[in-house]
A protein has these predicted regions:
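Generic L/I/V-rich hydrophobic alpha-helical segments across diverse proteins
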Residues: 14, 27, 31-34, 38, ...
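Short runs of predominantly hydrophobic/aromatic residues within well-ordered alpha helices
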Residues: 7-10, 27, 48
Length: 61
């Protein structure tokens, strides 16, 4: 499960991506960013579910 700081960092990254590319990142791009940012963590199925939820929430106009 993602902690508050990780979730916030991911949400900020998604918002910055949208400003730069004028589209939402793909889910796999979010996974890749998270693995790059937190190299000491292995993504669990719970993490992936949380990331998908954060992406969905931040994809709304």
């Amino acid at each position: 499960m993602l902690n508050i700081d990780e979730a916030s960092a991911l949400a900020n990254w998604i918002q910055n991506w949208k400003k730069t590319y004028k589209e939402n990142p793909k889910l796999n791009e979010c996974f890749t960013w998270f693995e790059w940012k937190y190299q000491d963590r292995e993504l669990t199925s719970s993490d992936k579910s949380s990331i998908a939820t954060i992406l969905r929430y931040n994809s709304e106009e």
